Swiss-Prot record:
GTP binds at residues 30-37, 57-61, 75-78, 142-145, 177-179. It comes from the Bacteria. It comes from Francisella philomiragia subsp. philomiragia (strain ATCC 25017 / CCUG 19701 / FSC 153 / O#319-036). GO terms for cellular component: cytosol. GO terms for biological process: division septum assembly. This is Probable GTP-binding protein EngB. The lineage of its organism: Bacteria, Pseudomonadati, Pseudomonadota, Gammaproteobacteria, Thiotrichales.
Amino acid sequence: MNYTKAKYIMGAAKVSQLPEDTGVEVAFAGRSNAGKSSALNTLTDQKGLARVSKTPGRTQLINLFDLGDNKRLVDLPGYGYAKVSEAIKKQWQSEMENYLTTRKCLGGIVLLVDSRHELKEFDSLMIEMAISFDLNLHILLTKADKLNNKERAQANKMIESFLKTFIRTDKISYQLFSSLSKMGLDKLKEKLDIWYQ
């Protein structure tokens, strides 16, 4: 797949505003400061494709990018310490759940988790949701260039230990990743290529 062809299509506030539910979509999700926009820009080799905001949590829309052949990348709203009201946060969360549970063309979810921190409530929720709805999930442990080898091993172990608490995790995979050094970029592309087949 040629990810450099990605073109912005639209931003939707609600799932009902999305284009027809056909083809294949891969959704990127993550807390506001997990490096989601940077990862999308690195994947597509386009610096400004997904806006890297200085105010985390500004992605309030479901943003879609066309890859051709009825294949799309989806940037889900950043979730976390956004300076918005609880009511708006709840609205985002319900739209996100709606997207993940009703979108038939969803080929998989890439969940971005900051490798330097423990799993947050949102991360755990996303993993649990993927398992309960039998969705493909690939966890990117981002900002791994900032870790030494011991810390990288600890980040992998953290995910491994969490996944051990579930019976079925055959559709879940994880890897270290860095937008800055492009560490793990080829592995990410390989995973997406399978989902887009």
